[in-house]
Amino acid sequence: MLKSFSKKLFPALAIALIAAPLLGQKPRPASTLRQKPFPSATRGAIEEALGRKGTPSPGGVLRFGFPRGDLQVVKSGITIRPALALGSWVAFQRIGDHAMVMGDLVLLESEVESVMASLQENGVEQTALHNHLLGESPHVMYMHVHAIGNPARIAKAIRTALEFTETPLAASPSAPAAASVDLDTAAIARTIGVHGKVAGGVYQLSVARREKILIEKHEVPPAMGVATGINFQPTGAGKAAITGDFVLIGREVNPVLWELTQAGIQVTAIHSHMIDEQPRLYFMHFWAIDDALKLARGLRAALDRTASKK
């Protein structure tokens, strides 16, 4: 009887095992797929709507910067360069025929209401509105945005919202990037553990996290705003003003805060930038003016308390 049962059972099991992937298996989430760049026509439509060229980044991301060169913001006696803390940006990630868009708009208080209303009317969500710095003059707010849909329409919506600000929107001629700043960038890079780049008179470093970040099952690459950002603006004699934000999960928040404060680095904000991301992320903003290498060591100690790529 067992032999007869086996003859019936094993063919049935074989059919079930073969059919399961075909009938019951869910499609792989986008987080496991390598995202491709936008087709040239789509990229052109995005760039035309925003009025400038984008910068391609890994993960099918096209990123745009809108430096607030119109603002003269001073903190602790330092005039903040746009590349240090005053750069609006938006990033477009290809999701099939659509795009996921994330960004951060640098706004004066007087600009917030009009920009928010414009974005809402055109289908772009706000996921956070807050400070990044403390004690700067004039006071600056940061509005984080998110949308999924037709990339050209989203680009037009963002451009329309920016027209309610004094943000310079005309595409400026490409200027050669500064080859160096008055800092020992090689020593800073060795200390932090990653190489940076010079942009707008500021030495910028980015440190990605080790785990995947997901929104609606889509993997969010570091260029979409989920990497720790560290910026050094030279102030003379080997010193620098630093600011940026650590991207953290909950259990990392207080250990990182401890390391920063022990290094004389002020924590200026702790908050979220997104909604419904996995894992839940917290962003810790910081500020200090001191010897650049001393600050780099403090930042490295804080990074060591995180699951960041080394």
Ranges and model annotations:
Residues 1-12:
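Bacterial N-terminal signal peptides that target proteins for export
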Residues 11-21:
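Bacterial N-terminal signal peptides
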Residues 26-67, 71-75, 163-208, 212-217, ...:
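Intrinsic disorder/low-complexity detector
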Residues 30-34, 100-109, 143-148, 174-175, ...:
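Second-shell loop/turn segments in exported
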Residues 75-91, 129, 211-236, 270:
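Intrinsic, low-complexity N-terminal interaction/targeting segments
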Residues 81-83, 109-135, 222-225, 250-275:
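Extended intrinsically disordered, low-complexity coil regions enriched in Ser, Thr, Gly, Ala
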Residues 88-91, 133, 141-148, 221, ...:
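A conserved regulatory-domain signal marking ACT and ACT-like small-molecule sensing domains
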